[in-house]
Amino acid sequence: MNFHIVKRENCPLWKKCCFYLGAVAIALLLGAALLSALGVDPVAYYTRMFTMGTIGNKIAYKVWINYLKDFVPLALTSVALSLAFKMRFWNIGGEGQFILGAIAAAFVAFKAGPVMPAAVTLLLMCAAAMVVAGLYGLFVAALKVKFGTNETLMTLMLNYIALYILIFISEDKGEWNFFLDPESLRPVFASFAEIVAFPSIPMAGKFSLNICVILTALVGVLVYIYLKFTKQGYEIAVVGDSAGTARYAGMKVNAIVLRTVFLSAALIGLAAAFKAGTAGILSTSITNDVGWTGIIVAWLSQLNTAVIFVVSALICVLHYGSTVAAATFSQVDSSFANMLQGVILFLVLAADFYTRFRVVMDKKGGNGNGNG
């Protein structure tokens, strides 16, 4: 009796949904088993986590405001990474690009904020962050097209260079370092929240919607249109399928790679500007690991721009909700969400395998055309 893996000719959408939802359900059941072993009621914990403690909470609006502060950079970074991934350029440098974008945005806030109108300063912050992060990504793309370097290793190493630049800024009390609070005896980042900040739009009750949420949604729509309905988006798809075919068709593959990677990194810089402009201060943990989590979100979404927003929202619920739940259930650490996220990723990848392939079992001497 032999087993064979056979590629599926097609898999109906309803069946794909069943596979993916089943994978998530199994992950939640495994999490429930662990919670039970710790003496925690899984239903109570999951209710607390997925509602983020908003039920019966008089300050629930603050929970949603803080939740959106986490959602915006993750969603935008994931969308940005998907651009490069569609072209099979493995941009693992989201963390480094985000850090340098945040530093550039803070630089503009400190230097231009006191002397320019807030709207102009915010635009300059976004532009500076996009240019600096974009050039950081473009550097790797240039090495790739010129010398054939491995972009995965290059972007990974550049993450650490950017991180140590930020750490150096956070620890050096030299007179040049305007990023630090001059009145503090120990190195502490200075706040620029009173100088400039992204405004919020009043909504129902005390809830206010930061303009960055609207801008992120707008960028998502523009990226979707760019990929689906423009010549440049078509070129990205062709290069992703086969660079050789793209060259045979007369496409300038190197230029497409450079342009797309710059755009991908620049959008990560924009996410950093939104984060810095909302927080009003730099920190060594300003990325909140969105560069790494964004890779997971992009792949779970199968590089679909619309699905990226949904998955980002769910991942943020896991992260933010687990922190809220940890305050109630002391037996469970807030890192439970990271474990659950890993299990979900593993099982969804397994489900994705079954949407693309099927396992057939042949009896000895069979012709290998059985159904599975």
Annotate each predicted stretch with a short phrase.
Residues 159-229, 336, 363, 367:
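Transmembrane helix-bundle core of multi-pass membrane transporters
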Residues 10-18, 85-93, 115-119, 123, ...:
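Short loop segments and helix-boundary regions at transmembrane helix junctions
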Residues 262-342:
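Transmembrane alpha-helical segments in multi-pass inner-membrane proteins
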Residues 39-44, 85-102, 145-154, 235, ...:
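Short, non-helical or kinked segments that cap or interrupt transmembrane helices
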Residues 14-41:
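N-terminal signal-anchor transmembrane alpha helix
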Residues 205-281, 305-306:
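Helix-loop-helix "hairpin" substructures at the membrane interface of multi-pass membrane proteins
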Residues 33-36, 51-111, 126, 130-149, ...:
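Single transmembrane alpha-helix segments in multi-pass membrane proteins
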Residues 1-24, 241, 248-255, 322-372:
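Cytosolic-side transmembrane-helix boundaries in multi-pass membrane proteins
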